[in-house]
Amino acid sequence: MVTNLLGVFGFLTVILRAVILCAQTFAVGGVIFLLLIAHDPTLRSDSWVRPASRVIRWSALTLAFAHVFFVIVNSLVLTSSIDLSMREVMGANFVIAGTLGAAAGCALFFWPGGLRGPANYFTLIPAALMIAATVLTSHAASRMDDRVVLVAMTTLHYLATAAWLGGLPCLLLVMKNVTDLDVLARVSSRFSRLAQFSVLLLLGAGIVMSIYYVGSWNAVYGTAYGVMVTTKVIFFLCLIVLGSANYFLVRAMGTRSNDRDTKISLIRFAEAEIGIGLTVILTAASLTSQPPGVDLTQDRVTLHEIAVRFEPRMPRFESPSLDSLSPSSKEMRRKAKLAGRKLPPAFVPGGSMLHINTPGDIAWSEYNHTWAGVAVLLMGLLALL
């Protein structure tokens, strides 16, 4: 079982990190929304506070379970791949962070009154602990240099993301369940101002972290980390466009007779923002699986190599022959066991790899990606119908 876990460990940690970031964003963002946007009792009604509290509480519980699984998976991999006992692993930073995050998530889920009562600023305590737990397992906490600056920027980044993207589900619930246009205008206006401030924080923190983590222009296109940061920036710009449209709609609300049409437009834009926001968060989770570009000073991809790779050519639609593919790691371990040999459970730098990718392996990867691209293209075309 543990051997199979090693094979999917990288993918599994990215998935768990994505769940943690998404759940944290909605839980903390919901708390911020209740305390900063809707603290006035005249803006609160059971029609939207009840479902909003459910979103916050279940996000917090999801966060708790994700932290528990994250600790279990990492602990099993560590004890099976290197000579560490479970007792020694229990003192690792990721265990402390996971325990802290799980406790904070459970505290918010079991909060007295289910968050439906008056604004309670003590809920900021578990919200802050959630952010702290995630920061402890980020790139910032593992850096040897400039750790204080990077931890501060990462914290601001998470807080701003939660305040903006995490508050959108609550705003959506207000717009769908409240009929009083005056209340809608006040809530939307307050959230718009908070979103603008959050965007400034995100932009500032993002620029600082990019300088420290990417380091140079050739790392932007020459490393996987730089390319993924660029992807995040593109999605961020898409969110800015949608947010700008929302800003002008909010300003118009209450000044013309078709406010109900404005409300519908706000709902549609908010739904689109949530979807793109989730994509940005998933991209951020993928970044944690990559070393920062500034650390990869060797073997960076050049512009010439990129141009050659992107030169138009017919895609591969046929699978390579099975004989040209490398044997599976599971099959290699089975044969090694029958031969009385023991293969390393994990790759050790400087050691030998189980196998090196052959031209057949590369062709197989291209074949899979080609058909995956066809599927995505068809889905996009169908969405336009």
Named regions from a protein language model:
Residues 1-351, 360-363:
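Polytopic transmembrane helical bundles with strong interfacial aromatic enrichment
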Residues 21, 357-380:
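The feature marks the first
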